[in-house]
């Protein structure tokens, strides 16, 4: 049986830490996204009127949200578990009568919650720039939650793997950010030459952005079923990796 009190203590601690750094945790990603709207939505949008029948300013909204969700989910979760390792507080958590599942629910739940809040703030902010309408609110919410949970798990893995703050930033900067920008955030992959279209399909972020965009406009580069399958596959893969890390004590007992 899950010790909900233990989960709540970890969850509350992580959420309070976010409120103490409110400007960095919530305002910063929203301001960055707003600047993307100004630069890409206004400047480039005046030259590219429509993509697949959707005004360019509207077209980039799901991609910009996904950009913020991915980066913030990873950052929140990776720092959330790495900092206790760095300070040695993780040993207090591991020695307490708390199961790995409860530790995971506390840290990942808090990281995902912070990202979901950011997602909704960005959604509200987007309405100041474009007349936003969501065709499938249920699927939008489903992709939002699945993405935040999946990449919070991925961030948790990075936080356990990293030996220093440089490694903590290595994967997000060198891998995640390029994948997001090359994943159809600001364009449709149909605009690419056939060869690059085929290469782009190996980018998992394409399926996240495509499925999320479909929930807004019923426009996508790949089918909704494939997008959902990729998200679920990534989710269960991360769960399996975290389970292995706890089972073997990888970077937890060092």
What positions do the PLM features span?
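Hydrophobic transmembrane alpha-helices and immediately adjacent juxtamembrane helices
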Residues: 1-137, 142-254
């Amino acid at each position: 049986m899950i010790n909900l009190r233990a989960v709540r203590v970890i969850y509350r601690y992580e959420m309070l830490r976010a409120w103490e750094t409110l400007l960095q945790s919530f305002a910063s990603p929203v301001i960055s996204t707003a600047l993307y709207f100004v630069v890409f939505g206004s400047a480039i949008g005046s030259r590219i009127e429509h993509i697949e029948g959707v005004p360019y300013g509207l077209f980039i909204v799901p991609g910009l949200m996904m950009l913020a969700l991915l980066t913030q989910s990873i950052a929140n979760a990776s720092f959330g578990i790495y900092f206790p390792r760095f300070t040695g507080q993780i040993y207090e958590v591991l020695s307490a009568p708390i199961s790995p599942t409860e530790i995971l629910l506390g840290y990942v739940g808090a990281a995902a919650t912070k990202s979901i809040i950011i997602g909704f703030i960005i959604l509200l902010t987007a309405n100041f720039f474009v007349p936003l309408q969501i065709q499938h609110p249920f699927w939008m919410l489903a992709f939002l939650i699945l993405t935040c949970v999946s990449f919070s798990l991925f961030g948790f893995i990075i936080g356990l793997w990293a030996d220093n703050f440089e490694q903590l930033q290595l994967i997000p900067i060198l891998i995640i950010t390029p994948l997001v920008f090359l994943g159809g955030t600001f364009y449709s992959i149909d605009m690419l030459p056939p060869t690059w279209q085929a290469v782009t399909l190996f980018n998992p972020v394409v399926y996240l952005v495509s499925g999320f965009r479909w929930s807004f406009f019923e426009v996508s580069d790949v089918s909704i079923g494939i997008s959902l399958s990729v998200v679920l596959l990534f989710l269960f893969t991360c769960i399996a990796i975290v389970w292995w890390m706890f089972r073997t004590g990888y970077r937890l007992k060092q």
